[in-house]
């Protein structure tokens, strides 16, 4: 079972562990002269609400998986999450060759293929 402590309207910026590793590898091989004085980049990702994520879960794993979500609001967690950025425009990173998933469905596909316990042989 999984506890959902926030409303389904909460939006996050997401990328897979696969993309995070690709970001590091690409950054390590990047010609840094192209960065100029601004050395920070916002990495690509997917802006998605919790509702978007639940809908993608339903498409990938069915209603049975969604039924395992226990909605229990937690005001402390809601307060923390409320201060997080909701979306980014990672144009600079994209122009430099960084890339990530483009949908929540793709994020779930990557998880099932690489990170789910069944993918690990557990």
Model-derived features: where do they sit?
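Residues in well-ordered alpha-helical elements
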Residues: 18-21, 51, 91, 101, ...
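A conserved pocket-lining segment of Rossmann-fold NAD(P)-dependent short-chain dehydrogenase/reductase
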Residues: 1-15
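Residues at alpha-helix termini
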Residues: 59, 95-97
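Amphipathic terminal alpha-helices
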Residues: 71-73, 83-95, 102-122
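Short, flexible active-site loop motifs that bind/organize anionic cofactors or intermediates
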Residues: 10, 43, 83, 97
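Residue-level detector of short coil/turn "hinge" positions at structural boundaries
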Residues: 65, 100-101
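Mid/C-terminal beta-alpha module of Rossmann-like enzyme folds, strongest
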Residues: 15, 19-81, 118-120
């Amino acid at each position: 079972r999984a506890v959902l402590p926030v409303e389904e309207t909460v939006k996050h910026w997401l990328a897979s562990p696969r993309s995070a590793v690709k970001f590091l590898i690409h950054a390590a091989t990047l010609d840094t002269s192209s960065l100029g004085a601004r050395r920070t980049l916002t990495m690509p990702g997917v802006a998605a609400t919790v509702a978007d994520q639940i809908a993608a879960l339903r498409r990938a794993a069915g209603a049975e998986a969604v039924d395992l979500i226990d909605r229990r609001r937690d005001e402390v967690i809601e307060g923390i999450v409320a201060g997080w950025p909701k979306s980014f425009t990672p144009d600079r990173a994209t122009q430099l060759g960084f890339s990530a998933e483009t949908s929540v469905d793709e994020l779930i596909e990557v998880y099932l293929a690489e990170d789910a316990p069944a993918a690990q042989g557990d």
